[in-house]
Amino acid sequence: MKNKVFASIGDAVKDIKVGRMVIVVDDPGRENEGDLICAAEKASPEVINFMTKYARGLICVPMKHERLKELEIENMVEKPTEKKGCSFTVSVDYKIGTTTGISAYDRSVTVRKLIDKTAKHEDFARPGHIFPLRCKEGGVLARTGHTEAAVDLVRLAGFYPAGIICEIMNNDGTMARMSDLIKFAKKHDLHIITIGELVNYRRRTEKFISEIVNVDLPTRYGDFKLVLFEDLITKDSHIAVVKGVVKNRQNVLVRVHSSCETGDIFHSLRCDCGDQLETALKAVGEAEQGVVLYIHQEGRGIGLANKLKAYRLQEKGMDTVEANKALGFDPDLRDYGIGAQMLSELGIKSINLMTNNPGKINGLESYGLKITKRVPLEISPSKSNEKYLKTKKEKMGHMLKKV
């Protein structure tokens, strides 16, 4: 294994291609589980035995809905209550040429037959010893689970989109955490990757934004073009408000603005979002060319309902970061790949970015955009939002001089 904790997605895909396993973890900064993953096409008694002997978790087969439908393999329960939203189906055994179904040989046969187009639904006994998992359409871009990571990885490796996964446990039966997984990887010469990096890889290498329509947009700030984009995975709509000719222009003035219904529409004084949007539109309207992106990522990515729940916690004394964490969210869940692809579709590669947020700069640059200059977009604090802005400066690193 290389002398670093996390391998590249490219290295992991190479391993999958030659039939090796990789370890996939939820998040490097959290105490979450790691799963062994390999391609279902590479299922063998040796692979199954390794998983049962060394990983010790439940062996499952993530796969696409279409194949499960062909085999008439239904969900295990009609209304799952499992908190991570993992979609288990009924367990199965392949009936032909197997015995009890539990041996490494029998389970490897069942895995291979699940993806064999000649195998029919009547060839499988229910229940059994292999647990198919229904992958969410869109893979890790739709759900950041091991199920989706497995299907994405094997697809990238050129195999049929189905994998084998098994949680890794310690000798004493406890779940293996990050330090344990690093030792496990070194012992067995395996690469470790994160689901987050797989998400980033797909967003960098695949197109998932499509232009739907563009229209003239006369406003109090000037005459613009409004370009509507659709996220092909989530079906969310995002807007680009464009001034002048921006295609192939250098250092275009850009604001990437996340939606804030309370601030942008109802002029809430809890935040500076509405004022920032108006200031950005005014600046772009006065420029020769520019763009304001309006991204559907309410509440820094947690959605309107959760944002309002966070407001309730703030009314009880928490700040915006503490409230997010109390609800189980990171302080900022926004995905800048959406904005980067919208700018790319508009033919823009270098920008002057209106922002106070260093995370936004890093996020956009990670997708290949050149940020020539940062243009501050600071709004004077009010009594209602002073604590909010102070928290953004002290806990989120925002570059604010007036707070």
Swiss-Prot record:
Catalytic activity: D-ribulose 5-phosphate = (2S)-2-hydroxy-3-oxobutyl phosphate + formate + H(+); GTP + 4 H2O = 2,5-diamino-6-hydroxy-4-(5-phosphoribosylamino)-pyrimidine + formate + 2 phosphate + 3 H(+)
Gene3D superfamilies in alphabetical order: DHBP synthase, GTP cyclohydrolase II
Pfam families cross-referenced by the UniProt entry: DHBP_synthase (PF00926), GTP_cyclohydro2 (PF00925)
Catalytic activity, EC: 4.1.99.12, 3.5.4.25
Pathway(s) the chain acts in: Cofactor biosynthesis; riboflavin biosynthesis; 2-hydroxy-3-oxobutyl phosphate from D-ribulose 5-phosphate: step 1/1; Cofactor biosynthesis; riboflavin biosynthesis; 5-amino-6-(D-ribitylamino)uracil from GTP: step 1/4
Segments passing through the bilayer: none
Name used for this protein in its record: Riboflavin biosynthesis protein RibBA
Gene that produces this protein: ribBA
